[in-house]
């Protein structure tokens, strides 16, 4: 492949976008939304000690959300739109190969998406100045956002080469993005709830009379707090169904927001709680990896439990430490899927073409 020819294709695509007034309007609306989000985040986290990481994570998540909503429109008609406008065929008869055309349009779509990150840069800088933001978290989160923009751009360009109608390819690109961002959550919840297991729990506690006083083993009526004299009830058994999210947690690994949160380094406060949105998302997703207890036992007559101890609660920090990251697997799946679609688009766009969809314009 010739880099100069690929850049020429990308530059032509970018020049067409720069000439459109709607492009600048879209960037302006994007900036206004981020301004409002940043202001609200400052109000929400400003009263917290060390609220900078929380503000930064909110702005980054909203930036990724907005780019995911905009990118399908910018890349979903790159090839079939040119075919409808009769501008693809003149390019195909030049020295530019099909692969160079595809890569050039992909690079242009990626750069276009990065323009929105550039608009978000001042707001991200403000959030970094406001609080003590972890520089490692800043660097990793921005890299993941840039890569996710590239993945969505590649999917949109590929679908525009696979499908003949621009409107249809844009719609399918939106569906793919929705499947990754929302469909994975829905599938995780529904399948995890459907794939359930039976749990049998046992519990017992001290017995109390009608006045609310504990019953005493020696027949007395004043044994409050004397555990060796308080009467303990019989064991009670109950059976119920427990969702098995630990069997389907991998479905979330390809979610763009889960990848972003899981890859970003997390810092914790003294109680083991994350100091940003990334950490809370990571802890929530990682907790799904832990199998549920199918035979729980609660002994209210145990002195440790009676005194308020015996809890098996895990802090988010402990949950993250006991589980494994999955962001690199999800990102690899996304990249492989985008690469497969690009190969399919190359096969559909290459010339000479043996067959074309009915009604396809070639010149």
Language model region names:
Residues 38-39, 44, 57, 63, ...:
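Secretory targeting signals
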Residues 15, 19, 99-116, 120, ...:
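Alpha-helical transmembrane segments of multi-pass membrane proteins
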Residues 74-115, 349:
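Helix-loop-helix units of permease transmembrane domains in multi-pass membrane transporters
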Residues 55-86:
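Long, hydrophobic alpha-helical segments
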Residues 59-66, 75, 142-147, 329-336:
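Hydrophobic alpha-helical transmembrane segments of multi-pass membrane proteins
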Residues 68-75, 155, 341, 345:
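Hydrophobic/aromatic residues in alpha-helical transmembrane segments
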């Amino acid at each position: 492949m010739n880099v100069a020819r690929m850049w020429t294709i990308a530059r032509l695509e970018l020049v067409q976008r720069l000439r459109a007034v709607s492009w600048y309007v879209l960037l302006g609306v994007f900036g206004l939304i981020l301004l409002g989000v940043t202001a609200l985040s400052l109000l929400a986290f400003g009263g917290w000690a060390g609220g900078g990481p929380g503000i930064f994570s909110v702005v980054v998540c909203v930036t990724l959300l907005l780019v995911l909503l905009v990118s399908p429109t910018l890349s979903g008609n790159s090839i079939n739109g040119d075919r409808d406008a009769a501008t693809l065929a003149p390019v195909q008869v030049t020295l530019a190969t099909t692969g160079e055309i595809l890569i050039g349009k992909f690079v242009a779509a990626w750069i276009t998406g990065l323009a929105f990150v550039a608009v978000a840069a001042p707001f991200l800088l403000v959030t970094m100045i406001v609080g003590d933001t972890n520089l490692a978290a800043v660097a990793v989160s921005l890299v993941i956002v840039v890569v996710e923009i590239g993945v969505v751009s590649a999917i949109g360009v590929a679908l525009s080469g696979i499908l003949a109608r621009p409107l249809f390819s844009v719609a399918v690109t939106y569906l793919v993005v929705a499947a990754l961002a929302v469909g994975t959550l829905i599938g995780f919840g529904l399948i995890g709830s459907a794939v359930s297991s039976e749990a049998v729990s046992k519990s017992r506690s001290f017995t109390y009379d009608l006045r609310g006083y504990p019953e005493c083993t020696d027949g007395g009526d004043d044994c409050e707090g004397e555990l060796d004299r308080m009467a303990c009830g019989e064991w009670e058994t109950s059976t119920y169904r427990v969702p098995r999210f630990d069997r389907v947690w991998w479905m979330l690994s390809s979610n763009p927001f889960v990848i972003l949160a899981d890859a970003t380094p997390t810092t914790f406060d003294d109680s083991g709680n994350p100091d940003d949105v990334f950490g809370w998302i990571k802890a929530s997703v990682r907790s799904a990896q832990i199998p549920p207890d199918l035979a729980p036992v609660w002994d209210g007559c145990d002195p440790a439990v009676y005194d308020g101890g015996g809890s098996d609660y895990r802090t988010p920090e402990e949950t993250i430490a006991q589980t494994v990251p999955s962001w690199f697997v999800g990102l690899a799946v996304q990249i492989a899927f985008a690469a497969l679609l690009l190969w399919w688009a190359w096969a559909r766009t290459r010339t000479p073409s043996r067959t074309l969809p009915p009604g396809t314009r070639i010149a």
